[in-house]
């Protein structure tokens, strides 16, 4: 679970984001794909927050991550705070 990385840092998942991933039947591998292959969201987010969108067919998937310090692992990591799917996103 903690072997998936983005920009060299591991990705941890918040409880709510884990529920969203399970609901959509997706894994951290899918999150990494969105972060690496997706495009920046047109929304403004707080400094240090990254939101990426990826179009797949008629659906657009989005992932929101923030950089944080993981107390158990004793290292910086990304925390997935939101994962979602919607229709009618920007066509890039």
Predicted regions mapped to residue ranges:
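Ribonuclease/tRNase effector modules and their secretory precursors
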Residues: 1-92
